[in-house]
Amino acid sequence: MFTLAQARYLVATLQPRIDELIGIRADLAELQADLAGPGMSALGGRAEVKALEARLHGVLEDLNSHDIQVKGIAPVLLDFPGEREGRAVLWCWLEGDSDVRWYHRVECGFAGRRPVR
């Protein structure tokens, strides 16, 4: 379980890994698009796809090792189990947010997101 302060600290601390994930995601998408066409890319071939996929999984494993729930990678969506007013919640960070500014009850999901006040 995370407090809001702990979730915010982890996002700030892990921002370099999150940025790495975003870069890998972009490289992988570009490489796969190139290889789907004429089959050539300045970024490489199938071996480079496999290497990027391995790097992507490594970053995801790192995030998961902190008990962070990675809900999406395009965009990156991270949930941190916590408690608010006696209820189980997920502190929610979405790619582009400067901080953990949202939460939702576990049973409500993303559609139930509310701003942290």
Where do the PLM segments sit?
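Amphipathic coiled-coil alpha-helices
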Residues: 17, 24, 31, 38, ...
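Long, hydrophobic N-terminal alpha-helical segment
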Residues: 1-36
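Short amphipathic alpha-helical segments at helix-loop
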Residues: 6, 41-44
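Short, surface-exposed, charged/polar-biased interaction segments
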Residues: 28-31, 35-42, 49, 77-80, ...
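Glycine-rich, aromatic-bearing surface loops/beta-hairpins
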Residues: 64-117
